[in-house]
């Protein structure tokens, strides 16, 4: 899991994920490196597949949904693994051919369009929260001004 979630630990940077994937693939070439990418999309210049992750998945109601997508998720990475995931995440025999339902296409596309701006604004807000609460004496993670790998700000 890239994001710290509810744990008091630093989130994993894409660079760290790359080092882990490289080591895992060196020691176990057939091992599949899967990354839960929730809260991490668009925060750094690269995403985990660019540095060796075989498969990533995340939610479309968070970063990539631009805060307006009401439902959905995604998988990305090696095409054979994406196809296998699609066949397991939908009804048998449908695979990736099913597409979205509930007339969500417009909201999903608008969310993808808004996502870079929403993520950038969220990072600015999280940094402000870190600074204000640290000044008030609270422990925060990450600290204000720190490089971030996801949107999570713990206080």
Label for each model-derived stretch:
Residues 145-153:
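Conserved glycine-rich beta-strand-loop-beta hairpin in the small C-terminal domain of fold type I
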């Amino acid at each position: 899991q890239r994001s710290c979630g509810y744990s008091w630990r630093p989130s994993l940077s894409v660079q760290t994920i790359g080092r882990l994937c490289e080591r895992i693939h060196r020691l176990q070439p057939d091992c599949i490196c899967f990354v839960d990418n929730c809260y991490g999309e668009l925060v750094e210049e690269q995403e985990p597949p660019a540095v060796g992750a075989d498969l990533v998945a995340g939610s479309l109601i968070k970063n990539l949904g631009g805060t307006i997508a009401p439902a959905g998720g995604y998988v990305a990475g090696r095409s054979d693994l994406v196809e296998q995931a699609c066949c397991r995440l939908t009804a048998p025999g449908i695979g990736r051919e099913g597409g979205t339902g509930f007339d969500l296409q417009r909201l999903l596309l608008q969310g993808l369009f808004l996502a870079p701006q929403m993520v950038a604004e969220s990072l600015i807000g999280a940094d402000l929260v870190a600074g204000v609460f640290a000044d008030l004496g609270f422990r925060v993670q990450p600290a204000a001004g720190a490089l971030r790998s996801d949107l999570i700000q713990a206080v």
